Amino acid sequence: HATRNTLARNRMLARLTEATEQGTLLATHDNTELMWLRRHVGTDDIAEPEPYLFCFKHDWDALTLTERVLRTIKGLAEFHPDWAFWGYDAALLWGLEVPNDLLGPRYLVKTGCSVPLSAGCRLLRPQAAGVLEQVDGVQVTSFWRTVEDCLLRAPFSYGLAIADSALRAKGVSRDDFCERLRIDCEGKHGHRRAQVIASYADGMSENGGESRFRAFFIAYGFPVPELQVEFRDPLDPSQVFRVDYFWQLEDGTCVIGELDGKVKYTLQNGEGRESVDPFVAERQRESHLTMLGHKVLRFTFDELKNPGKLVEKMRLAGIPRRPDLAEEWRRRWYGR
């Protein structure tokens, strides 16, 4: 009996390990396995984050929200092979930037399967989903259909993060993107706002945080900065700094904007790239950028929660706010 229990335990732990290595949750239809796993939830470092889906607790606790959602979707697809995903869920599978605030209920294409409406799922009829594709073994709406579905319902700053990442992934121009939206989405609910988002999209934006700050600049009437401008280190021309935002104002003043938490530098030596302590590199880079004679303005993500204070910070940095630009954005976004 003890030997049988040990074999069962080793088999299940091996299956959990395999699921972890594959970036998914363990899904099982086997009642014996299910009973064993549920007996050991809370012990043996096993968790059941979704019904019938299991993983190691220490691994789950270490994941970001995005990683948790991705593993959940893959586990659900394993458990329900006839399920397909759209909207923000599909966007994650396609590798798009989906802000955490948009990650909640599942976005399911109703393919004749039994979907628990009580779970708050967002359902889409198959005939409305278009041609489905497979990404990492999961059925999802096509890339551009996914982007369009997201922009039709996303708030401005979140939608801009998704749109920027779509342009970055596919290398298409903003004009081509807007034309695609016009052809595919004209007449649909949310089309006008989707077009507003697309009209500001920029594939040079490297992540969702950068996109959301740019959305703030746009909505509050500040000039839109250049993105990912490169500077040579004045003390060491072999080192290149790439900054998040760069404003060149009418009076000739230049302001560099940096979103905290991301170090962008390339240090070359005889063998190629050399690693540098990130904290030291961040401080060194900032001090060297100031030697170029430019102001350096640092942003933290929490500042988006207090737009009034952020407006004042921009004013003190000398970046002019134009009420007419803010009004133009409000008119386009709200339709008045």
Protein language model annotation of sequence segments:
Residues H1-G190, R321-R322, E327-R336:
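Short gly/ser-rich loop at a beta-strand->alpha-helix junction or flexible surface loop bordering the NTP-binding
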Residues T3-A19, T24-T32, L167-R336:
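Surface segments flanking catalytic/ligand-binding clefts of nucleic-acid enzymes
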